[in-house]
Design a protein with these regions (language model features):
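Conserved "HGTGT" condensation-loop signature of ketosynthase/thiolase-family condensing enzymes
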Residues: 1-77, 113-139
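Conserved catalytic cysteine-centered active-site region
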Residues: 54-106
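Gly/Pro-rich active-site capping loops and adjacent beta-alpha segments
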Residues: 103, 107, 112-117
């Protein structure tokens, strides 16, 4: 198998749950980054054959296609969203390598979407009825 060239790579910022990025949707973080990577590589957005995006906390929709459009890819770009709780970004890169190796694409954007900042706060629901234990109040 031939080596798969990586023209550029970058990382979006991360923050804790409910932190500074809680109001940002994943494609809003990634689109400027992808546009910059394409510009640095000297490629127009129309050169992208596919976008493969790993997503750990999907809330519906199609984040890979939304990212492709937000980064400037015209038309209806081929896009694949992989929904996985662990290693979603790595799975996306592996899938992109397959597209390249099989000759199905020449230029692929691949990676993971940061969405943990937007994770909902989930509380454990008791399995039986009864009074809930109270935490001590402030001093």
């Amino acid at each position: 198998m031939n080596a798969m060239p990586i023209l550029a790579w970058a990382r979006t910022p991360v923050a804790p749950v409910g932190g500074a990025l809680a109001a940002c949707r994943p494609h809003e973080l990634a689109a400027p980054l992808v546009a910059r990577l394409l510009a640095d590589a000297g490629l127009p957005a129309s050169a992208v054959d596919a976008v493969v995006l790993g997503n750990a906390l999907g809330a519906g929709g199609h984040p890979a296609r939304v990212l492709a459009r937000a980064a400037g890819r015209p038309g209806r770009p081929p896009a694949i969203t992989l929904d996985s709780q662990c290693c979603a970004g790595l799975d996306a890169i592996t899938h992109a390598c397959g597209l390249l190796a099989l000759g199905q694409a020449q230029v692929v954007i691949a990676g993971g979407a940061e969405a943990w900042s937007r994770a909902p706060l989930r509380l454990h629901r008791p399995t039986q009825a009864g009074p809930a234990p109270l935490a001590p109040g402030p001093p």
